[in-house]
């Protein structure tokens, strides 16, 4: 299972320099039987990004993309974990993404993000990360 935060989902909804490589990488992962997920937070943030920056018709495209993902709920235990997970420099919404991914830790093969703080948090908790197309 691949977890995608909002920085990754945005690249699938709005063309950015990493979009092509991310799509290619996801296609390869899908060919190996990998499913993808985000959290309820990722769903909300993605729809807000499209509302703010998207072109006509992108709302429907975003809904189609999100319908193809497993949407992980933000339960009380997830929110509780978000209060303490990762380094102190991790921002609140990033901590929620990290805690949401922890729900699927056993199945998690990669956490896809382009956020440097979140990458650091992922590594601190032992998640494998991917940022296809990113220059590091």
Curated annotation (Swiss-Prot):
Cofactor(s) required, per the database record: Mg(2+)
InterPro entries: PIN-like_dom_sf, PIN_dom, VapC_family
PINc domain ranges (all copies): 2-104
Similarity section: Belongs to the PINc/VapC protein family.
Keywords, comma-separated and alphabetical: Hydrolase, Magnesium, Metal-binding, Nuclease, Toxin-antitoxin system
EC number: 3.1.-.-
Protein name: Ribonuclease VapC47
Binding site for Mg(2+): 5, 94
Pfam families in the cross-refs: PIN (PF01850)
Gene Ontology biological process terms in this record: negative regulation of growth; negative regulation of translation
